[in-house]
A protein has these predicted regions:
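Walker A/P-loop NTP-binding motif of AAA+ ATPase domains
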Residues: 1-165
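The conserved phosphate-sensing helix
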Residues: 168-183
Length: 183
């Protein structure tokens, strides 16, 4: 059993690493985008949280295997809980977080949560993760390697084209990939 947080800037490879890890372990990935779990309807977010874990355990039972549970953008609902709750919305959000906390506490399997904002995650949630792995933005040399790997070799480039100059821009791998795709 492992509960892991991958954290770092957008486009640094957190989600890609989770899928690569699953592939190397010969496991499926059951992925959820946490920003889509929150609901404006009373009680719906709590149901959505329970459904994540129920779906995971059902899949384990049906396939007789254990997928990796991937929660993308976990900071969406693992943020600091409200103290001195006054509004009904705050109460519902805290209740949803408490359910999530309980589910993580009792989770059997491998769970990977990704976030761009580790500092926004409530300390009670943070403590329940065995590992916190930072994904840093690539340095100039790493960016150069990324550009060289991603730029199609058969493209007609201008004579003055210099791939080294591209690595001067502080971009993540995800951003470089987007630039290549949208050329």
């Amino acid at each position: 059993d492992a509960r892991i947080i991958f954290y770092g800037a957008a486009g640094t490879g957190k989600t890609m690493t989770a899928y690569s890890l699953a592939k190397s372990l010969k496991r499926q990935v059951l992925a959820f985008d946490c920003s889509k779990i929150l609901s404006m309807y009373v009680g719906e977010s709590e149901k959505n949280v329970r459904k994540i874990f129920d779906t995971f355990y059902d899949l384990c039972e049906k396939t007789k295997s254990e997928p990796i549970l991937l929660l993308n953008e976990a900071d969406q609902f693992l943020g600091a809980r409200s103290s001195g709750v006054t509004s009904g919305a705050d109460q519902m959000h805290n209740q949803m977080q408490n359910i999530f906390l309980e589910q993580i506490e009792n989770f059997k399997g491998m769970l990977i949560a990704t976030t761009n904002l580790l500092e926004n995650i409530d300390k009670a949630f943070s403590r329940r993760f065995n590992y916190k792995i930072e994904f840093k933005k690539p340095n100039k040399e790493q960016r150069l390697e990324l550009w060289k790997k991603m730029i199609p070799v058969d493209e007609p480039y201008e004579k003055k084209f210099d791939v080294n100059a591209l690595s001067d821009y502080s971009l993540t791998g995800g951003q470089i990939n987007l630039i290549i795709k949208n050329k």
